Amino acid sequence: MRFAIVVTGPAYGTQQASSAFQFAQALIAEGHKLSSVFFYREGVYNANQLTSPASDEFDLVRGWQQLNAQHGVALNICVAAALRRGIVDETEAGRLGLASSNLQPGFTLSGLGALAEASLTCDRVVQF
């Protein structure tokens, strides 16, 4: 079965992103296909390259990145929500005249079209 996940909570401070990550790992372990994860609203903070959790905490941001690298899961970030919250890639940083970017490698700034496509092409869409 093909799945897509929507994450609306930040990497730290709520359980939404952590639960979504654990669900993603369970899907893959059970042989399902996870096509994409779409980060929306506060969920865009999962793509912030500048997070630095305590040494005894799981690094959820890098966990998502590993999911992308190891399993080819698309990590789509809502561009409008990201820009409002200061998450930018190199292209947007240049366009906006910012000194640097902070989008974690493996994540892609995307429009809501990416979510619509996932909804149409996957068997299930699960929101956290």
UniProtKB/Swiss-Prot annotation:
GO molecular function: sulfur carrier activity; sulfurtransferase activity
Compartment(s): Cytoplasm
Primary residence: cytoplasm
Superkingdom, taxonomy of origin: Bacteria
Active-site residues from the entry: 78 (cysteine persulfide intermediate)
Single GO cellular component term: sulfurtransferase complex
Keyword Transferase: yes
UniProt-listed Pfam families: DsrE
GO biological process: tRNA wobble position uridine thiolation
Keywords: Cytoplasm, Transferase, tRNA processing
EC number(s) recorded for this UniProt protein: 2.8.1.-
Functional note: Part of a sulfur-relay system required for 2-thiolation of 5-methylaminomethyl-2-thiouridine (mnm(5)s(2)U) at tRNA wobble positions. Accepts sulfur from TusA and transfers it in turn to TusE.
Protein family membership: Belongs to the DsrE/TusD family.
Quaternary data: Heterohexamer, formed by a dimer of trimers. The hexameric TusBCD complex contains 2 copies each of TusB, TusC and TusD. The TusBCD complex interacts with TusE.
Protein name: Sulfurtransferase TusD
Source organism of this protein record: Shigella flexneri
